[in-house]
Regions:
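Secretory targeting signatures
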Residues: 1-32
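Extracellular calcium-associated, cysteine-rich motifs in secreted modular proteins
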Residues: 26-67
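Cap/lid segment of the alpha/beta-hydrolase catalytic domain
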Residues: 341-364, 376-463
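A conserved hydrophobic secondary-structure block that centers on an alpha-helix together
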Residues: 193-220, 224-225, 359-401
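Acidic, low-complexity Ser/Thr/Gly/Pro-rich repeat segments typical of extracellular/periplasmic
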Residues: 67-344
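Short regulatory "switch" loops immediately downstream of catalytic or recognition motifs
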Residues: 1, 24, 150-156, 338-341, ...
């Protein structure tokens, strides 16, 4: 028994020792990880996060305030050239209407929106599709601008002293920016200006400008009739003097104006002396002639070498009773037509690309005068194609050339030059004062007249 008791005591001691190793104290637990943003500068900072999960979101930095422009322009428009505050399209030709276009020969395309074109008293103006098709300004363009007061031009080159415009101190300059050539010109003000309007100051060239060429214009050291110096517009002064403006258009042109000022400086012009200056680019030959060349080629193919035909409606022997005319012949000939109507105002039919489109053949009047001397001498004579004056007609020119025809032994032939003829064009031009868009339709009639003359010559040389 005693041994059993000792055995039990020994077992209890061992068990108690083992239990003391397991229960002698609590084991520490690893802390729970809390992922989140731990950056106090972040918008989504989590103060309870113990592990960064890279989820921090930071506020957008406050944009730097735009610097205050040096000049705030009172006259701004998305449709106008902001350089001149007096008129939307000034200075003219305005560089603001030249749009970059890599598909054209010049790299530009002219775009004058309808909102920029002066409205008549009868309605608003639309853009001119004929103008906006070309890749620059006309080489025959007018060049002019306005100032706050009218300059005294008495000391500048006029039409009798054009050579003075090339003097080193002359107040106006016209320079070819591609070649550096100074162009002779004269200066005049618009004598028809009204008291409540700024006066146009023109630079008149003595010849057409080069095609596809850049030009610069400069006015400097101008004074008014009282001898007071004339200030440039706020926009121009900002460009000249390097002052910033609140006009995106002005700022977008600044680099090009810097090039202009550099070119004028190379011609001896002090930058500070300028009161107005601008640049423009003329259209390419292909762009200017694209409509009429297409019409000519299309009409030539339709006409062939001998034309389509003619109808004689009247023959008068001995016309004029002055022994100068053997025979006067009147009639019509067939001509390819591209105008919607023979009667103005009418527009040219064009396809979706703006190219003139053939409509049909129509009959156009002609007059032929054969001088008496050819009949008397039994010989033929050269044929002379006549034009006519403003609002005239071909018949009047042919019948009025009897003496000249008989003296020279030439056969006279003529038709009306539509657009400036007595055949309804006076009324059409009157309508153009109401709707200026009609002016471009008159130009389209001119092109049709060229085709008419081509058809007339083909027809009668083929007889």
């Amino acid at each position: 028994m005693r041994n059993n008791a000792k055995t039990k005591i020994a077992i209890l001691l061992v068990i108690s020792m083992l239990l003391s190793g397991c229960t002698g104290g609590e084991t520490e637990q690893e802390p729970e990880e809390i992922p989140g943003c731990m950056d106090e500068a972040a918008e989504n900072y989590n103060p309870d996060a113990t592990v960064s999960d890279r989820s921090c979101i930071y506020p957008e930095p406050e944009p730097e305030p735009e610097p205050e422009p040096d000049v705030r322009l009172a006259s701004q428009s998305e449709f106008c050239d902001d350089v001149n505050p007096h008129h939307c399209m000034l200075p003219f030709p305005a560089p603001a209407f030249l749009v970059d276009d890599g598909t054209t020969a010049t790299g530009y395309r002219l775009h004058i929106p309808g909102e920029a074109i002066p409205d008549s008293g009868s309605g608003t103006s639309d853009e001119f599709h004929m103008i906006n098709r070309v890749d620059g300004y006309s080489p025959s363009t007018q060049i002019f601008t306005t100032f706050e007061s009218t300059p005294d031009v008495s000391g500048m080159a006029d039409q009798y002293s054009i050579g003075d415009s090339l003097d080193s101190g002359h107040s106006t300059l016209l320079i070819n920016l591609d070649t550096g050539e100074l162009l002779p010109h004269w200066v005049e003000v618009d004598m028809r200006s009204q008291d409540d309007e700024a006066t146009f100051v023109y630079i008149r060239t003595i010849r057409g400008l080069d095609h596809d060429a850049s030009y610069g214009v400069g006015y400097r050291n101008l004074v008014d009739s009282g001898g007071n110096s004339i200030e440039g517009s706020d926009a121009f002064v900002a460009l000249r003097d390097g002052l910033t403006t609140d006009s995106p258009q002005i700022e977008s042109q600044r680099a090009q104006y810097e090039g202009l000022f550099e070119a004028l400086g190379g011609a001896g012009v002090e930058r500070a002396s300028l009161q107005a200056a601008w640049f423009f680019h003329t259209a390419s030959t292909a762009s200017i002639l694209q409509d009429i060349v297409h019409m000519r080629d299309d009409a030539s193919q339709r006409l062939g070498d001998d034309g389509i035909g003619c109808n004689v409606t009247e023959v008068v022997d001995g016309y004029g009773d002055d022994n100068a005319t053997f025979r006067l012949i009147r009639g019509t000939f067939s001509t390819p037509q591209y105008m919607e109507s023979d009667y103005p105002p009418a527009e040219m039919r064009r396809d979706s690309s703006g190219t003139p489109e053939f409509i049909e053949f129509r009959e156009v009047v002609f007059t032929i005068l054969i001088p008496q001397i050819l009949a008397d001498e039994g010989r033929s004579g050269l044929m002379t194609v006549l034009g006519h004056g403003f609002m005239g007609d071909g018949d009047g020119m042919a019948t009025g050339s009897r003496e000249f025809a008989n003296l020279t032994g030439r056969v006279m032939i003529a038709t009306d030059w539509k657009g400036w003829s007595a055949d309804g064009d006076f009324d059409a031009l009157t309508y153009s004062l109401i709707n200026v868009e009609y002016f471009q339709h008159q130009h389209e009639r001119h092109m049709q007249s060229i085709v008419n003359n081509l058809a007339m010559i083909r027809t009668f040389t083929g007889v």
